[in-house]
Amino acid sequence: MTTDLTDRRQLILKLAIQEFIESSQPVASELLVRKYRLNVSPATVRNELAALEELGYLTHLHTSAGRVPTDAGYRYFVENLMDRTPLSATEQRTIRHQFYQVRSELDQWIQLAGAVLARTAQNASVVTPPRAQQARLKHLELISIHDTTALMVLVLHDGTIRQQTLTLDMALSQEELSRRASRINERCADAPVERVEEFLKQERAHEPPGGDALACQVLDLIVKAMHQFNEHLNSDIHSDGLIEILNQPEFSQVERVRRMIEILQSRRALGTLIPRALSSSGVQVVIGGEHSYDEMREYSVVLSRYGGGEIVGVLGVIGPTRMAYPRAISAVRYISAVMSDLLAELYGIEGDTHWEVES
């Protein structure tokens, strides 16, 4: 929705959304005039609220005369109206200190990021480990174990190692195995799964029928391992903050609690958001009905990738659409910067963010 709003309507929409986020109660014109000392009458504000409802930014509940924001209203607020409210300098120093205390333990980074995000944004959090954006073949070795038995050692770009014992059709020396591995390395080094699949297709087309049996066997295993890696990339999600999100009034009903637990545990819906965050720069905000999964349409998600180059992860918060967006966005932005700088410092992974104190 790109409707231009007058300055007065923008102000009233901003105040109405801020008030609803803070109180969780439908917002009436009298309250806005009284609390924010507006220099207009309640009747004027009431007319403006009605106009904003006609434009699709607000709606009202049948049991109340007050208005509540729609998804379109929240979107307009996030893109045009909200004030940027960075974390305080004290909060930033505390967060940075916490991460430095565990800087050599990657698993603890992930747990700490989830806990700090949830506590800071007062919502549930999601974090994925830093990985290659997609599997790429770094190196292959074939090691002779016995006459007709070999060990395949596959190393992916992020350091992931896969091992598989192979049964050979004929006895092959270590020299011959190394030659076959070198040929695959030459053709597929730094290749994504699509290129490996293309090479496998070419091998199968060669004489003798079916091509080089060992090469095809090895390439087929590589393709399967890379597909598994890519699938795991979108499902390896650490979540935290269930206690924080259950403090929100939206979760006073048991059914909504059950649905939220299901979302955090199943990973299916959240997993669809990971590729979007990985392929985008900056903080991404997905609000309510913008989600492709129906079960996510009562919630908003604020996500950002962290890291740099090929090695990246995603972190963010999930909560009701009545989310304190400025706070959530600042928390996600700052913690992603901290994580990026840690990766750059410890692993030489260049990120595009730094630990400068936001102000």
Swiss-Prot record:
It comes from the Bacteria. One of its GO terms (molecular function) is DNA binding. InterPro entries: GAF-like_dom_sf, HrcA, HrcA_C, WH-like_DNA-bd_sf, WH_DNA-bd_sf, WHTH_transcript_rep_HrcA_IDD. Transmembrane segments: none annotated. Keywords: Repressor, Stress response, Transcription, Transcription regulation. Pfam families: HrcA. GO terms for biological process: negative regulation of DNA-templated transcription. Gene3D superfamilies: 3.30.450.40, Heat-inducible transcription repressor hrca homolog, domain 3 (3.30.390.60), Winged helix-like DNA-binding domain superfamily/Winged helix DNA-binding domain (1.10.10.10). Negative regulator of class I heat shock genes (grpE-dnaK-dnaJ and groELS operons). Prevents heat-shock induction of these operons. PANTHER family: HEAT-INDUCIBLE TRANSCRIPTION REPRESSOR HRCA. Belongs to the HrcA family. This is Heat-inducible transcription repressor HrcA. It comes from Roseiflexus castenholzii (strain DSM 13941 / HLO8). The gene is hrcA.
